[in-house]
């Protein structure tokens, strides 16, 4: 591959001359009222002047020639001889350059010049000397900054009994990311949590065992934190999860604790408001979470007895994860079915243990939506820069995980009923609002920790 003896700017000038000559030839049709401008092109125009050092040919006849060698205290004869030698060499260089221009026109016409510049050239104000302008061109070149990307952090249980290659982690996106605001992921409803829309942060009212079962009041957001304890002999496979309500100045209030039962054919979690006794027979027992064999469907029950007729066990929620047997890559798709709400903001009592009633899951399968509410996870947006799916958690989630999700209703996708995501290896944030209660939200979060054979 031959090396052209001209600078890139000179080659562009020759290419422009060739294009003008070709456009003037018959057979070319061009618009008479359309002026095509290429702001990203590196070609020069008559209305733009670049102040930059462009090689020795640009300053041959200029008194400010940066290549000129000046000597102090030299004899007059020696100076004249040096200038004569320099002028002779410059003239020879000019003659050889002019003789090659005609040959280069045909060579350039068969090759398309590639514009190596990716940003428009900025005109730099001319300084006292030309070399100083050249240095300013390099020092004042605009720099582009890249948004920091989060490393994909996966739990040990993400690799247990599942095909993790089929699941993609969801990353949190910063507040200043305008592409996601255009996509409708600005999460305007979560801005009200800071007090802008009149929504206040919730606090515990009354006893803990009653508070965790009470639906959140409208206009109140509860910010919680889940910690996972995997210390001990068997907590690597059966960790304990603790739910705390976040308060100001780093304070927190314990709400619920949950653990997975060891001797159970399917995943079965016990939830209690007593952190010292996480058993079904404990006084603080609040309910349980049970899954099917494949881990695709979870049902949340309260502390009632399924064999009792006076106070039968009630269905609090059903979580359904879409199956992914073929292994398509993408985030989790989940559907949450809740009991409907009455006019006084109380849950409709639905019991699958009562033979006279139909459970939440059966109502959903029958498409009987009169007394149930259907929620879905908010669809993340694919980011080409980070090659990942992203959601706007407004600073509440800081690490990527397949567990990160937001629950919304189809009628109002900007009203985030619940969001859950990771902040460190064993710490997760969980925020919920009306119509969820702490027990329902905590059970939904526990279902995301459980291994799912057919979902990923």
From Swiss-Prot:
Localisation per UniProt entry: Cytoplasm; Nucleus; Cell projection, Cilium membrane; Cell projection, Rhabdomere
InterPro entries recorded: Tubby-like_C, Tubby_C, Tubby_C_CS
Gene3D superfamilies per the UniProt record, alphabetical: Tubby Protein, Chain A
Cellular compartments per GO CC: ciliary membrane; cytoplasm; nucleus; rhabdomere
Gene Ontology BP term (one): protein localization to cilium
SUPFAM superfamilies: Tubby C-terminal domain-like (SSF54518)
Keyword field contains rRNA-binding: no
Phosphoserine: residues bearing it: 149
Membrane topology: Peripheral membrane protein
UniProt keyword annotations, A-Z: Cell membrane, Cell projection, Cytoplasm, Membrane, Nucleus, Phosphoprotein
Bias (Polar residues) ranges: 120-152
Chief place of localization: cytoplasm
UniProt region (Disordered), positions on chain: 111-202
A Pfam family this chain is assigned to: Tub
Family from the record: Belongs to the TUB family.
PANTHER family, per database record: PROTEIN KING TUBBY (PTHR16517:SF7), TUBBY-RELATED (PTHR16517)
Protein name: Protein king tubby
Origin species: Drosophila pseudoobscura pseudoobscura
Gene: king-tubby
